[in-house]
Amino acid sequence: MTRRVPAPLLVLAAIVSVQFGGAMAATLIPLVGVFGSVTLRLTIAATVLLVIVRPRLRGRSTTDWLVVAAFGGILAMMNLFFYGALARIPIGVTVTIEFIGPLVLATVLSHRRRDLLAVAGAAVGVALISGIAGTPWAQVDVTGLGLALAAGAAWAGYIIFSARTGARFAQLDGLAIAMTVAAVLVAPAGVITAGSAIWTPDALWRGATIAALSSVLPYSLELIALRRLAAHVFGILLSLEPAVAALAGLLVLDQQLSAPQLLGMVCVVAASGLVMGRRSVPSAPAALAETTNQ
């Protein structure tokens, strides 16, 4: 059935799924905290992937395990930073600022000086989104902005190690193992900080929904789409994520953005489309930049 659906529509469906999963995560954080939310998301997603993928564990080299372990560690940090930012600032702002990570990485890999102008435009966009220019410093949520930037840096690291892991592990084997590593790293703190609240039906169904929307469904859709979609087209579609995140925040969380913030979002989306939408951008970052962080 998915063969009849145009690949761009599959990617758009994956983006919508991820961002609404992120908006759903913002409703889980007040119940079990950041660590508890990340624990539920990673543990459930890892369990589903292990059952579906059944990764091969034998015959792996030491380097294979080091690479996938590093991938899992970055995956854990990326989720913690992202959820930490979600707890403090709107999801549209979080995703837009986080997007600077893969944008800068794509610019560095492109080796084109003019792409620096796009990064500069994105920086202006982030300044508008954060409200730093027109808001007293004491009222700026510096911690939230810092966590979003840290999530972006981790996202760039995820792209790099995702490519390295993909080169060493067949299909989704590496992702399933890395997700398990991330879950093991975060789970102790998540269970301790959330306490009995993490086992309540409300928390569990929200966690399962987030895992499905943010991991299982988009991974499946993208795996199909990327087999018949050019990397530069994928990059253009990817640049729509901040806008979709803002829409999800409005519909699910009633988070409304100001005119300057919307203008800043346009700057980041335009910069991302220019850099990651070019045919000369290396395919690995474009193909791997999508949403495991959310």
Can you say where each PLM-predicted feature lies in the sequence?
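Structural signature of hydrophobic alpha-helical transmembrane segments
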Residues: T27-I44, F82-I100, D141-A154, P201-S215, ...
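Transmembrane alpha-helices of multi-pass small-molecule transport proteins
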Residues: I29-M77, V104-L105, A154-F161, A176-T193, ...
